[in-house]
Amino acid sequence: ALSNERPIYVIRYQGFNWYNAPMIVNYAAKSKEFWNTPCPVFVRGIGMEGGIGPVAGSSHHSLYFRMPGVKIASPMTPLEYKKVYKNFMREKEVYYVSEHRGSFGYKIELKNDIKGNKDLVIIAISITRFEAIKAKKNLEKKGFKIGIIHVLWIKPLKISKTAMNCITNSKYGGIILDDDYVDGIANNLANKISHITNKRIFTMGLKNKSAGFHKKVDNLPPTSDKIEKKIISIIKN
């Protein structure tokens, strides 16, 4: 990266960021600021969960979120990935790209639904975007008006003014879904969006516990059923 190359650094399981992140955030991300020497690295953090224990699983993009000099994106479709890579090639920044194995089989692009007045708006990150779509469809069958915003750019956060207005005009605000612990990106973005829209923003993500190797002790991102129940409880309470 220091010799005008653009390396791609692959972290096979995002949980391994606890070991890999220090050299990225403490050198590559600071090189441009300290020495005016860009160190553009494309970091592929690949998420997965389910029977892989307390170290490897889930998405851990929050580890990079508070550190300066890093941009974070979470593409879940082919065109989104191309967009992120093209941006990286135009800039001289460190990119942390939060991927997920669960998205690799999807070829259909994901679109926001922000037209009209909604009861509540789902703001979905990473692999939760697919379960969010299922929950949205189920809730609409029950008569609820549910919007959805698919978050590609996490840092800096990029949500259009039109999408923000959809949250502002909704009855009950929004809910952020993430494949990470909520005491990180989810709560941070909830606070930020709440200030902009003057609406309550709820969060859902991983439970505050370590995952085991058996399905009974796993720690998985919110399912469509759990999302649906949470949204109904928000609307009715």
Where would I find each of the regions flagged by the language model?
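Conserved thiamine diphosphate
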Residues: A1-E131, I146, K192, I235
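Thiamine diphosphate
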Residues: N36, H100-N237
